[in-house]
Amino acid sequence: MRNKKIILLSFFTILFFASHSLSEVKHWNQIDSDDLTQVEIKDNYYALFKHDQAELNKIVTQCLEVIKQDNDIMRNELKKEWKRAFLKSQDTWEKLIESDKKVIEYDHCGGSGTEIFILKYQIDKTIERIKELKERFCLN
């Protein structure tokens, strides 16, 4: 009878530690999948960023071409005003690109992802502003 109790107690002890170990493995797997999700979010963001950057670079090139040529649609005063506004937006964009690189580096070192989404919003707003300027001055 005593041997049965010892065997039963040993069995439940092993069962307890085995279930505890499994829950630890599950916990670490959950953390790994959460980290993977963060990496996927960063990768998706970076892909969007690259797409927006390419789109903006295309618009920038078109706009600079219009600034360089004489265009009857745009009177000189409008052209000057647009050029000032455009160059200011372009400057903002370049600063955002530079700060974005710093944020991505910071984020890879364990920083918060919040800054990335704030920058994405700022980048989107800058793109909208440049597109508005482009439409306003008939640059489509």
Where are these regions (language model features)?
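N-terminal alpha-helical modules
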Residues: L22-N140
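Bacterial N-terminal signal peptides that target proteins for export
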Residues: M1-L8
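Enrichment for repetitive, rod-forming helical segments
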Residues: F11-F12, R136
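N-terminal signal peptide c-region/cleavage motif recognized by signal peptidases
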Residues: T13-H20
